[in-house]
């Protein structure tokens, strides 16, 4: 798709930057309409790659190319990759009980598994205070959270489960012949292979990072996660590890290890919802039955979702990676994707 003269002048004005597309090699995309949709809803960036090649970049509302912005819960996926890397390296087993590493967990917490921490079905209270700055030991705070649901039965989205996972990984790695911190392990096994450096970790006084949020990435940097999703885990994980990572749970088949999927879109009775709106409800009022990100778009779509509609979409069947960064302004995943894909 070749940019129109008007659009070209728009580029020169510095409001939008776009790259021409060879229509014979790329899917038919409504790039102009999608960029307008993003810009009109307080979007800062729309960045699209096809087969690893950038086919569209646009920046609006004062944003500039190359700026790193908060991806909020998009951070979770990187730690999910680190968890599966630790499984591959023999440090963790998903079915292993957390209490095998954290013996102080007893009673109802005794049988919680590492996998239940990573798919947010462990039953722990959400622990939203763990997002705060200036904490002494957020890992201990997470370990002390009470059980509010039977492990394995309910999806409870919040930072506490991931902080417990961090404590497990921290103790596992500390026991090795050459001990390293989880942060250094993340950098070596996940970030460096993706061409990324150290990130914004928001450590507490004990040095524990916040796993639920914190990273700041440019569209180009974040798109490397999308490249990995299209490549079924390369260069970080084996394909079979990716299958486990994206499996979902009985409590919420659309989520696992920091990633959201659209598989239900191809099923009878699928429910397209605004995931951020659903997460705003108390956990026991949320309904994750048959939910999908967007109807009418490929069901193999995978998403990393951050607050205020920070989005990474990867669509393997179309070889597409799509990044949207901006503010919350009546943005709809379904409307945006249908606008772009037609």
Residue ranges and their predicted role:
Residues 34-64, 312-315, 319-323:
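A short, well-structured edge-of-sheet supersecondary motif
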Residues 197-199, 247-322:
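Active-site Gly/Thr loop motif
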Residues 88-122, 174-213, 217, 233-234:
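Active-site helix/loop module of the DD-peptidase/beta-lactamase fold
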Residues 66, 127-214:
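Catalytic-site signature segments of enzymes, centered on catalytic residues
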Residues 19-35, 41:
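C-terminal segment of N-terminal export signals and the immediately downstream linker at the start
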Residues 164-168, 213-234, 310-325:
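Active-site-proximal alpha-helical segments within enzyme catalytic domains
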Residues 1-16:
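N-terminal secretory signal peptides and thylakoid transit peptides that target proteins
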Residues 52, 68-95, 117, 165-170, ...:
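Active-site SXXK
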């Amino acid at each position: 798709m070749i940019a129109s003269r008007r659009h070209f002048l728009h580029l020169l004005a510095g409001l939008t930057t776009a790259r021409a597309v060879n229509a014979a090699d790329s899917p038919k995309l409504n790039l102009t309409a999608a960029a307008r949709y993003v810009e009109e809803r307080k979007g800062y960036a729309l960045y699209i790659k096809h087969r690893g090649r950038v086919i569209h970049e646009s920046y609006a509302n004062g944003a500039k190319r190359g700026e790193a912005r908060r991806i909020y819960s998009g951070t979770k996926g990187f730690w999910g990759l680190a968890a599966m890397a630790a499984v591959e390296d023999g440090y963790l087993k998903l079915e292993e009980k957390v209490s095998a590493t954290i013996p102080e967990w007893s009673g109802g917490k005794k049988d919680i598994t590492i996998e239940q921490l990573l798919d947010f079905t462990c039953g722990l209270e959400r622990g939203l205070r763990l997002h705060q700055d200036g904490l002494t030991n957020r890992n201990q705070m997470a370990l002390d959270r009470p059980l509010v649901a039977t492990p394995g039965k309910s999806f409870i989205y919040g930072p506490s489960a991931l902080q417990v996972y961090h404590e497990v990984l921290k103790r596992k790695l500390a026991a090795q012949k050459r001990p390293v911190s989880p942060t250094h392990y993340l950098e070596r096994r996940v970030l460096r292979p993706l061409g990324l450096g150290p990130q914004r970790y928001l450590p507490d006084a004990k040095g524990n990072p916040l796993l639920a949020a914190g990273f700041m990435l440019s569209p180009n940097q974040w798109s490397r996660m999308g490249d990995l999703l299209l490549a079924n885990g390369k260069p970080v994980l084996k394909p079979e590890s990716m299958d486990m990572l994206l499996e979902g749970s009985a409590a919420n088949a659309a989520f696992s290890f920091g990633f959201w999927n659209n598989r239900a879109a191809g099923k009878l009775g699928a429910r397209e919802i605004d995931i951020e709106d659903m997460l705003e409800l108390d956990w026991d009022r949320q309904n994750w039955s048959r939910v999908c990100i967007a109807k009418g778009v490929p069901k193999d779509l995978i998403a990393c979702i951050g607050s205020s509609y920070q989005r990474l979409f990867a669509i393997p069947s179309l070889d597409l990676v799509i990044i949207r960064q901006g503010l919350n302004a009546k943005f709809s995943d379904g409307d945006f994707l249908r606008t772009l894909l037609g």
